[in-house]
């Protein structure tokens, strides 16, 4: 019997962004800085889809940091920006993730890390969070020049996995990820 395939969004679904909260507050002086940054990042990626602008998640993450620095009238140094972006590679998994992934894999499911982030970043995130043994495959949409929820990125995942798109399942915290 062929394994069923489940794609997992990584940022916020598998990995917990809350560890970034004190770092963002220290740099920007606001409890809301992290959520504002991530919202701007996701908004920008959606605008890129709608306007067919090619970018990378890394470029958008940098631009979103600049935007919130301006919003909070903060002098964002290159060192602070680098520290914030580097910390994104060291996020912990949510407390129930390892047990959930293990249960799925033990029951014959193929688990796939699937993200808008670069392959290098996702691979680092998976390794640094201790999840290397919990995913069969890691897929970045970066190669497509677009982002979730553009339907092309799901077709790309299906092609990469050599599976019909209708055989794929997606687990995501964000409902818009499932609209592609």
Which residues does each predicted region cover?
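An amphipathic alpha-helix signature
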Residues: 21, 34, 38, 58-66, ...
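A short acidic, helix-capping loop that chelates divalent metal ions and anchors anionic groups
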Residues: 23, 45-50, 121-123
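Substrate-recognition "cap/lid" segment bordering the active-site pocket of phosphatases
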Residues: 112, 118-169, 179
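Nucleotide-sugar-dependent
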Residues: 172
